[in-house]
From Swiss-Prot:
Known function: Catalyzes the transfer of a dimethylallyl group onto the adenine at position 37 in tRNAs that read codons beginning with uridine, leading to the formation of N6-(dimethylallyl)adenosine (i(6)A).
SUPFAM superfamilies given in the database record: P-loop containing nucleoside triphosphate hydrolases
Coiled coil: none
Family to which this protein belongs: Belongs to the IPP transferase family.
Protein name per the record: tRNA dimethylallyltransferase
One Pfam family linked to the record: IPPT
Region annotation Interaction with substrate tRNA: where it falls in the sequence: 39-42, 163-167, 244-249
InterPro entries per the UniProt record, alphabetical: Dimethylallyltransferase, IPT, P-loop_NTPase
Amino acid sequence: MTDNKSQKVITLMGPTASGKTALAIELVKQYNCEIISVDSALIYKEMDIGTAKPDAAEQAAAPHRLIDIIDPAKSYSAADFRRDALAQIEDILSRGKTPLLVGGTMMYFKALLEGLSPLPAADEVVRAQIACEAQEFGWQALHDQLREIDPVSAERIHPNDPQRLARALEVYRISGQSLTELTKTKSEAFPYEAVQFAIAPSDRKVLHRAIETRFKTMLTLGFTAEVERLKARGDLDLDLPSMRCVGYRQCWQYLDGEIDYETMVEKAIVATRQLAKRQLTWLRGWPDLIWLESGAEDNLATVMRHSR
């Protein structure tokens, strides 16, 4: 890929419920740009309400690329995102417009801007073997294995995160090298100039209230029925990345009778707040960010001024 630092892209990062979408739509109206979604929940079809997917009016005003691109039963990696995002960026730039990358999935932003390590492709035989071992011995035993071969990854990956735990073991068994060793090598650099913004309220209580209000609004819009439809498909379960999106797991547990309605609401709001906290932690360590206050009247002008 040709390196062309004279061509700009804009990134707009932020925690969930911080006002990213509203600002992005205003930018599309005022600035010659097109939106690329950077969100690991919005990629899924049939998951509209619980992911706060832009509605028909918002999509008409400002079409979003890389949403509704895969089925909830399928997987989609950071490497898949990087490939697809670079293709979308190139297409937008070729038509004389500015790509506007908007979202809160920091792993996707990191993969896009910093590159990825050359990890081995998935091996179904190895994966099946790991799954059998997990069924026989439990994920804790496999986590103990990981701790012996890759203590750094074991510290980062929880025993109750089977997808990432299995992947770390799979990488080692295929390559003979730990995930930590392999991630020291990165793929090619991002070939464009990135003007980077982050939006969040300075008062965390404001964000917490926004999260609570938004989830309760989702419920009135039919979120429970949405999860019921997904559950009724019969090919989805709580171990899939799609069903680990905040809110979906808790609603699924409610529909299974594991928790009552009030507990579901409380757990979903808490899980969303925890997600926002993790996103803010990433952002505080992110270099070269221009910070915006959620709801500030001059946000649009600030972005346009720095992006010219």
